[in-house]
Amino acid sequence: MDPVVVPLNVSWFSAGVSSAVATKLCIDEIDRIIYTHIDDQHPDTLRFLRDCEEWFGRKIEILQSHYKTVETAILMRGYGWIKQQKGGAAACTTWLKQRVRKEFEATQPKPLVYFWGMDVSESKPRPGCRSSRVEGIRDAMPKQSHRFPLVERGIGKEEAHQMLAAAGIKRPAMYDLGYHNNNCIGCVKGGKGYWNKIRVDFPEVFAARAALERKVNSSCLNGVFLDELDPKAGRHEGPICGDCGIMCEIFADAVDRHNPSHHAEPRLGGDSVDGVVGSPNKENENGR
């Protein structure tokens, strides 16, 4: 008989509420918890990560691309675009998240089972689409198996927030500021309402992204640059932009499939190879 191969169970922790609750629900089944850090995250994100480590009773591994920031990834590897307007793929996602995950996968000899924080609403077809986000993940990553603890238990976003609060864990600051996810500050996937809120809450980030758009002659929004955006455009109610993570990677994977030479172009600023660096905070590098 062939020996039984035990898979490696990995939670891709996004530092969002749903991801944290999903990880906690299956903590005894999970072998590794991994967070991909980007320097554009709100500083409170690492506080939340440390609180979750205590809640889980487990260490969260932190991986990070050596590009570190959204602007660096776009300038060094964006090839003149911030995100593709039709497909939604973001250059920063490709290099700051997707590449890091793929480099991890290349080092793993065991079958991989991924645990994701999608809630029950994301198991239903999206407006205008035949498939759900959950189905999209399975279709986009057929080499891995996938678990969705919140979906399996019928838990929605609101319930996940309630469960986190009941555990005494303060959610990331971006939620309390009125955002519906803990994405990078100034996420390039945001809509007009999102960007007008960023304009008020983080004016320096708004100005930096507007300058970046002009530098690469590509906009975050469809048909308008940020420095031309009507301050009254868009609206804030409802999710302002989707959670950053695997759905962004699905778009980026689609770009790879349709543009096989996309990543072969030389980048600006030297010949250093792509790679993953360790934790950005020594507390997590050396243990607490």
Regions of interest found by a model, annotated:
Residues 1-288:
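Nucleotide-activated chemistry modules centered on ATP-dependent adenylation/adenylyltransferase
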